[in-house]
UniProtKB/Swiss-Prot annotation:
Pathway: Carbohydrate metabolism; tricarboxylic acid cycle; oxaloacetate from (S)-malate (quinone route): step 1/1. Belongs to the MQO family. It catalyses: (S)-malate + a quinone = a quinol + oxaloacetate. Keywords: FAD, Flavoprotein, Oxidoreductase, Tricarboxylic acid cycle. This is Probable malate:quinone oxidoreductase 1. PANTHER family: L-2-HYDROXYGLUTARATE DEHYDROGENASE, MITOCHONDRIAL. The gene is mqo1.
């Protein structure tokens, strides 16, 4: 059964952190706008934003070695690390503003201070990390980072990683107390609760069937209620597709030229989760290692303290898996259905180029539990098999697209796609994703609300005082803002 059209100003597809962030920003900047949200599942934040479906790292390049590139001459390029840290500073400022204005309460339910650390083994890697720290510390954003090779100091930071270590190879650790663990699922739920109180219509168990633009310029979005089987067509001036792995198939339905020659490659993740509370309580850090030579960036191993509903947990991974699904709750036909006449060459080109990724995935799929435990023991030498269980994390769909230089290039970041007229936007890709949600949504607003954005800037600077500045170039502003963030988010 189909009901009549329903008109709205904004439609947000997907009940994750991206839609929650964009909806919250729009309600602050243009409260008169009528906003509707459609989510396929029964509650918000259950796919990529779910606490067990992502690493929960507040990505700020304090520990992630893949954000700093080493040159042949031994110098380290930290520009990407600084950019990602700046983006996360924007997220923290916005969350602090929402706490300050009473729109978010109990920040400890979604963010915790957890030190971020890097861990390397071997002379070459130790030399790299020393150069990395020396370069990063030139920026105020990394002023508190410490580097150590002293056994006692390292043991005071992460005893489980030092006890039982027998190798003669040199190791080094960095330590930054300003790191965080974020439960993006809990944050998403809080943001949507606040939006509902402000009159935003959030509908669950809703499957978006089609998105088509009319000659009048408005978008028609056909939505099926999964409980009643009724189909409703909604008219909207603006549509945002923030549906995680489902964003690509939905973008393809729009028919905009930006949806052509673009594909997606799904990668699933497995983690080892500790079941021994005594072990869990002895580790308090997010420790990132260095990806093996030839391995993709998403393979960086890390030993992670997590907080879920106030309880401490410990994870190690990721180990890559493969499923053709684009969502954890998706269909095994997702990958096949995403192949279109306009992107088949793009997809095949990527397949030929990315043989190393294919080889890596095959090797990961062949791992036994004992082999996974051996990988863990590189970090935690005394780890016992009986203290760990395997869990399946979320699906990530890596973007494949053509560039000016060549076809079929695999992208490892987060990508915003917008229509020429700015009436539709979609978010594709993976890490750093959720951590940079606020900055990414500012980009969406700038590209899609060009005429209104200038008038919004005073309010934006009230919410995010560093907007328009690079904090790395403004030490006094950084310290002033950091005091406010620390006060309201209760982090370091």
């Amino acid at each position: 059964m189909t009901t009549q059209h329903s008109k709205t100003d904004v439609i947000l597809i997907g009940g994750g952190i991206m839609s929650a962030t964009l909806g919250t920003l729009l309600k602050e900047l243009s409260p008169e706008k009528n906003i509707k949200v459609f989510e396929k599942l029964a509650q918000p934040g259950e796919e990529s934003s779910n606490v067990w479906n992502n690493a929960g790292t507040g990505h700020s390049a304090l520990c992630e070695l893949n954000y700093t590139k080493e040159g042949k001459d031994g110098t380290v390029d930290c520009s990407k690390a600084i950019k990602i840290n700046e983006q996360y500073q924007i997220s923290k400022q916005f969350w602090a503003y929402l706490v300050k204005t009473g729109q978010l309460d109990n920040p400890d339910r979604f963010i915790q201070a957890v030190p971020h650390m890097s861990f390397v083994i071997g002379e070459d890697n130790v030399a790299f990390i020393k150069s990395r720290v020396a370069t990063l510390k030139k920026s105020i954003l990394f002023e508190k980072m410490k580097l150590s090779q002293d056994e006692e100091e390292m043991k005071s930071w992460v005893p489980l990683m030092i006890e039982g270590r027998k190798s003669d190879e040199p190791i080094a650790l960095t330590y930054d107390e300003t790191g965080t663990d974020v439960n993006f699922g809990a944050l998403t739920a809080k943001l949507f609760d606040n939006l509902e109180q402000r009159g935003v219509g959030i509908q669950y168990k809703q499957n978006v069937l089609d998105i088509k633009k009319q000659k009048s310029g408005v978008w028609l979005v056909k939505v099926k209620d999964l409980e009643t089987n009724e189909t409703t067509t909604y008219e909207s001036d603006f549509v945002f597709i923030g549906a995680g792995g489902a964003s690509l198939p939905l973008l393809q339905k729009t028919g905009i030229k930006q949806s052509k020659h673009i594909g997606g490659f799904p990668v699933s993740g497995l983690f080892l989760r500790c079941t021994n509370q005594e072990v869990i309580d002895r580790h308090h850090a997010k420790v990132y290692g260095k990806a093996a030579v030839g391995a993709p960036p998403m393979s960086v191993p890390h030993l992670d303290t997590r907080f879920v509903d106030g309880k401490r947990s410990l994870l190690f991974g990721p180990f890559a898996g493969f499923s053709p699904k684009f969502l954890k709750t998706g269909s095994h036909m997702d990958l096949i259905k995403s192949v279109k006449p306009n992107n088949i060459v793009t997809m095949l080109s990527a397949g030929i180029k990315e043989m190393s990724l294919t080889k890596y995935l095959v090797s990961q799929l062949m791992l036994s539990n004992d082999e996974r435990m051996d990988d863990l023991r590189v970090f935690f030498p005394n780890a016992k098999n009986e203290d760990w269980e395997v869990i399946t994390a979320g699906q990530r769909v890596q973007v494949i697209k053509d560039t000016e230089d060549s076809k079929g290039n695999l992208q490892f970041g987060t990508e915003v796609i917008t229509s020429d007229d700015g009436t539709l936007a979609a978010l594709l890709g993976a890490s750093p994703g959720a951590s940079t949600a606020v900055d990414i949504m500012f980009d969406v607003l700038q590209r899609c609300y060009r005429d209104e954005f200038k008038g919004w800037e005073p309010k934006i600077k009230e919410m995010v005082p560093s907007f328009g500045y690079r904090l790395t170039d403004h030490e006094d502003l950084y310290h002033k803002i950091n005091e406010e963030v620390t006060k309201y988010l209760q982090v370091k």
